[in-house]
Design a protein with these regions (language model features):
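N-terminal glycine-rich, Lys/His-bearing helix-loop that initiates the first secondary-structure elements
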Residues: 1-53
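Conserved N-terminal alpha-helix of the aminotransferase class I/II PLP-enzyme fold
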Residues: 39-90, 115-122
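Conserved PLP-enzyme active-site core in the AAT-like
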Residues: 2-6, 12-20, 82-288, 293, ...
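PLP-dependent enzyme catalytic core of the Aspartate aminotransferase-like
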Residues: 1, 121-122, 130, 144, ...
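Glycine-rich beta-alpha junction loops
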Residues: 20, 33-39, 188, 210, ...
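Conserved C-terminal alpha-helix-loop-beta "cap" of PLP-dependent enzymes
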Residues: 289-376, 380
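Short amphipathic alpha-helical segments
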Residues: 54, 80, 219, 254, ...
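Acidic-histidine catalytic/liganding microenvironments
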Residues: 76, 283-287, 334
Length: 399
């Protein structure tokens, strides 16, 4: 199928279709399990001339399996370019380090994944890169935080773990007026639910370990971009100047697993979105539950924004019980659902953000992020929604 025709397909078809392998005509992609590739005179000359992406050199620089994953990510994100990385945090680190230098400033949402927050709030200050944390759901707060040296505005499409949804269009306008690059972490939504590049975002980062892979068996990340504001070869510059130097390429077998995951992304997310909505409605009416955060609920503060930006509301939700001890008792007594880290897979997983993912974030900062000690995060899987509801009911009955 020609690229122009494939571009007109609906999302489900784009995700499921992979062109056959040129050499074998296999409809499934091969795995190139090699760290080294043989040169000849022509390949040597291409390398000398700087045409490094068109040839295979060394596994840390790239691999044909990795390139196949990058091409498929471009298709489902609506991107002009993609760079695969070893993890979602590698995607975030590589994209930021590729854009920033000493003396630069970042405006970041105050509710972001804990490792992102810690990296910007602590590690980057060692290199004279400052960050101001604000509520990106409030465009005025973002605008007020800008400085002459602000190079990046960073936010999550659906915030981890509070499920906050920022309006993208005002952030795009602010970034363009200021000359800053707008980066969106789209992990909680996935490209099935939201494609931020279509809304004008400059760079999208994904933890492909989550919904994209979808089976809790592979770690990987992706940086996707449009070329209307950034140079066409921007990600290739980052590949060679940053990613290769940090040593964070995507492994070939993980690339193959993630390619397989993309093919079922649409059908998995359809079920996960439906189950999350059913579970959110049920928990909102439960007497032991203080509050539920899910963009599909009318009670969600940004419900109207979510309706505008997303055809469905994702497979993630959060709810709150009275105390951390109560939260632990609920999760420790779940039978069908897993009490485990990570998200976006075929099994429903749960965690207590305050004492797990955000454990290293000081309590005062967690309160500013609206992360309560009794907050429970749920990533819905492919189980029947009625069975999920029954499992939470029996666990909640014990507190």
């Amino acid at each position: 199928m020609k690229a122009e025709k494939r571009a007109k397909l609906r999302f489900d078809s784009k995700a499921a279709y992979l062109p056959p392998d040129d050499a074998s005509k296999s409809i499934n992609p091969p795995i190139f399990m090699s760290s080294s590739f043989q040169y000849d005179a022509d390949i040597y000359q291409q390398v000398v001339d700087g045409e490094r992406k068109s040839v295979n050199i060394y596994g840390r620089c790239g691999n044909p399996s990795e390139y196949l994953f990058e091409e498929q990510m471009m298709v489902i994100e609506g991107a002009d370019a993609c760079l695969a990385t070893a993890s979602g945090m590698a995607a975030i680190s590589v994209s930021l380090l590729g854009l920033l230098k000493a003396g630069d400033h970042v405006v970041c949402d105050w509710t972001t994944y804990s490792s992102t927050h810690e990296m910007l709030d602590h590690r980057y200050t060692d290199y004279d890169i400052e960050t101001t944390f604000v509520d990106t759901a409030n465009p005025d707060a973002v605008r007020d935080a800008l400085r002459p040296n602000t190079k990046v505005i960073y936010f999550e499409s659906i915030a981890n773990p509070t499920m906050k949804v920022a309006a993208i269009e005002p952030l795009v306008d602010i970034a363009r007026d200021h000359g800053a690059i707008l980066i969106c972490d789209n992990t909680f939504a996935s490209p099935y639910v939201l494609r931020p590049l279509e809304w004008g975002v400059d760079i999208v980062v994904e933890s492909a370990s989550k919904f994209i892979g979808g089976h809790s068996d592979a770690i990987g990340g992706a940086i996707c971009m449009k070329t209307d504001r950034l140079p066409e070869d921007f990600l290739e510059q980052i590949r060679w100047n940053t990613m290769v130097k940090l040593g964070s390429p995507l492994a070939p077998f993980n690339a193959w697993l993630l390619l397989r995951g993309i093919q079922t992304l649409a059908v998995r997310l359809q079920r996960q979105c439906q189950s999350a909505a059913s579970l959110a409605r049920h928990l909102e009416a439960h007497p032991k539950v203080n509050k539920v955060w899910y963009p599909g609920l009318e009670s969600h503060p940004q419900h109207e924004i979510a309706k505008k930006q997303m055809p469905e509301f994702g497979g993630m939700l959060t709810f709150e019980v009275d105390t951390a001890d109560a939260a632990l008792k609920v999760l420790d007594n779940l039978e069908l659902c897993s009490f485990a880290a990570s998200l976006g897979a075929v099994r429903t997983t749960t965690q207590i953000p305050a004492s797990m993912a955000f454990l290293d974030v000081p309590e005062e900062q967690r309160r500013e992020m609206n992360i309560a000690d009794g907050m429970i995060r749920i990533s819905t899987g492919l189980e029947d929604a009625n069975d999920l509801i029954a499992d939470f009911d029996q666990a909640l009955s014990l507190i």
